[in-house]
A protein has these predicted regions:
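Bacterial N-terminal signal peptides that target proteins for export
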Residues: 2-13
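Short intrinsically disordered, low-complexity coil segments enriched in acidic
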Residues: 2-3, 21, 463
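Bacterial N-terminal signal peptides
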Residues: 11-21
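Noncatalytic, solvent-exposed loop/strand surfaces
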Residues: 26-540
Length: 540
């Protein structure tokens, strides 16, 4: 029985005393382990990046087979001979985010190089919504490209963010630097509003509604509820692409702005714009913004997806891995207020921060700054911070275009304070990574861009084993049913045994690279390659 239930039903004196005792321990910031999720045969839903607000890529599903196969793709869109396959859906030519599943719908981000709707042509960002049982395309959201080109919206990258679903609404960050709230039913149940300009949005996004020519809409089109343009409203400058998934609380949508450097990789066009913001979940209005100076110290960009906890070291906290290599904890419900020019600004309260980039990566023995984008140089945080057992785990890395280099995974205990005092351990054998750690049963699994997968003790950082996939890795690990699943650039889904003892179970080969993270929802394993989404049924 949890403490909240004790407060509601607390009629037994001894249990009330126990509850007060636990509260006293929590107030001192001592260990209060997160209970392991109960085993669910089908794993439940997967409604957001990281499955829940902790960003921990693990599933309580059981009975997952390891003999599933990709089969041979056919011209009619099927995969002949694929074992355990329920359906396969064709996407565009590139996909970097992760699928999400909620209430009978599957959401993915891709591009439009292989149009699913004949009237939608040209390079665009695309969100597709599929029927969970059949893989039928229910509707899609067409997002025009920015005029800025590759400096802020690289060709054919599509939408790199994952949709988070909350009831009737889905929230996503577009390739245009917008945060959009969508009706998960699309236009099938009408244009619900309050936004009514979907026909104009398709021509120029939120930025060009006034001059855009409307296009014809049908029931396969997306229904926008509200939208917030971070570029227009905040003056931010996304570098190459806007790439981050939002996290939500009961009131707010927290999102990275993807603010970064310009084409020179030296200048920061918007050093005073926020790197993290909060929007009102119902209206899309700006509710708060980061004011810690992150944008002044950006190495490349802010691409990490924030995490959220309603009680981390005794406070509701939004955790952000930033473009300066630092992990921040901000109060998630209280904001400072500052007036300037007759306007009142709500600013995030910084609770703590930890530099996750080791000093020896920033400065050499002679005291000289080490150049960025060199093998021994400093890195920002691109992977997502993970909250597990009242601690935060964060890993540094860079844009894969910069190649391989030194990395680090840092374990942070916010109850210890801020800065170096909050560091529990730091593991430096890992290389640069854009992969998010997964934690289960006291173990941490982390992959690096070089292709290696590490198993560490979550409490001490001790390494138990490592595995080399011999291929670059963009996605993250999924821990499920005593197994660790990990896709790589060679199109291999590597499956290892979870635990302290190393054992490779099998490798499943696909005809295209896997840059996304596999997920499990409702007795189904989803594997997303660059071009197709495979749905495998099990245990039904």
């Amino acid at each position: 029985m949890t403490k909240s239930k004790l407060q509601i039903f607390g009629q037994v004196f001894s249990l009330l005393i126990l509850s007060l005792f636990i509260s006293a321990i929590d107030s001192k910031g001592e260990e209060n382990p997160t209970p392991a999720p109960e085993a669910l045969p089908g794993g439940g839903e997967w409604p957001q990046w990281g499955r829940d607000a902790s960003n921990n890529m693990m599933s309580p599903a059981t009975g997952l087979p390891t003999d599933f196969t990709a089969g041979d793709l056919q011209g009619d869109g099927t995969a002949e001979g694929a074992k355990h396959l329920k359906w396969v859906a064709e996407m565009g030519s590139q996909a970097y985010g992760t699928a999400t599943v909620k209430d009978g719908r599957v959401f993915i981000g891709t591009n439009n190089e292989k149009p699913r709707i004949a009237s939608v042509t040209g390079d665009k960002g695309i969100i597709m919504c599929f029927d969970e049982k059949t893989g039928e395309l229910l509707w899609q959201f067409d997002i025009p490209k920015l005029d800025a080109g590759k400096v802020s919206d690289w060709e054919f990258l599509g939408v790199c963010s994952s949709v988070i679903v909350d009831g009737k609404y889905g929230y996503v960050v577009t390739n245009r630097g917008e945060i959009i709230c969508l009706d998960v039913y699309g236009m099938a149940d009408g244009n619900d509003g309050p936004f009514q300009d979907e026909a104009k949005y398709a021509s120029g996004g939120l930025e060009k509604l006034a001059q855009a020519e409307p296009v014809e809409l049908d029931e396969k089109c997306a229904d926008i509820v509200w939208g917030y343009d971070m570029r227009s409203e905040l003056g931010v400058f996304p570098h190459n692409v806007t790439s981050s998934s939002v996290v939500i609380s009961d009131k707010y949508v927290f999102a990275s702005t993807s603010n970064g450097v310009d084409w020179s990789h030296i200048n920061i066009p918007a050093p005073h714009s926020p790197s993290l913001i909060a929007l009102d979940k119902e209206t899309g209005e700006l509710a708060g913004e980061e004011y810690s100076g992150i944008s002044q110290s950006i190495m490349h960009c802010n691409w990490s997806s924030p995490a959220y906890s309603d009680n981390l070291a005794g406070k509701p906290t939004t955790v952000f891995g930033a473009g300066d290599g630092v992990t921040y904890g901000f109060h998630a419900t209280e904001f400072d207020e500052e007036e300037d020019g007759g306007e009142t600004y709500k600013l995030f309260k910084e609770l703590w921060k930890v530099d996750c980039c080791p000093k020896e990566y920033r400065v050499d023995e002679a005291g000289e700054a080490i150049k960025y984008a060199t093998y021994p140089g400093p890195s920002e945080i691109i992977s997502s911070p993970v909250i597990y057992n009242n601690k935060v785990y964060a890993a540094i890395g860079q844009d894969p275009e910069h190649g391989e280099g030194v990395g680090a995974v840092t374990c942070i205990d916010p109850s210890r304070g801020t800065g170096e005092d909050a560091i529990v351990w730091q593991f430096k054998e890992v290389g640069r990574t854009i992969s998010t750690p997964s934690l289960a049963d006291g173990l941490l699994y982390i992959a690096d861009y070089s292709g290696r997968l590490y198993c560490l003790d979550a409490e001490t950082g001790e390494k138990y084993w490592e595995h080399d996939t011999l291929s670059h890795i963009w996605g993250s690990t999924l821990v499920v049913d005593g197994k660790v699943l990990l896709g790589n650039e060679d199109g291999e889904m590597v499956i290892l045994k979870a635990g302290k003892e190393y054992e490779e179970l099998t490798i499943v080969n696909y005809p295209a690279p896997i840059y996304a993270t596999p997920i499990i929802a409702n007795n189904t394993l989803y594997v997303m390659t660059q071009t197709h989404l495979y749905a495998y049924g099990f245990g039904e």
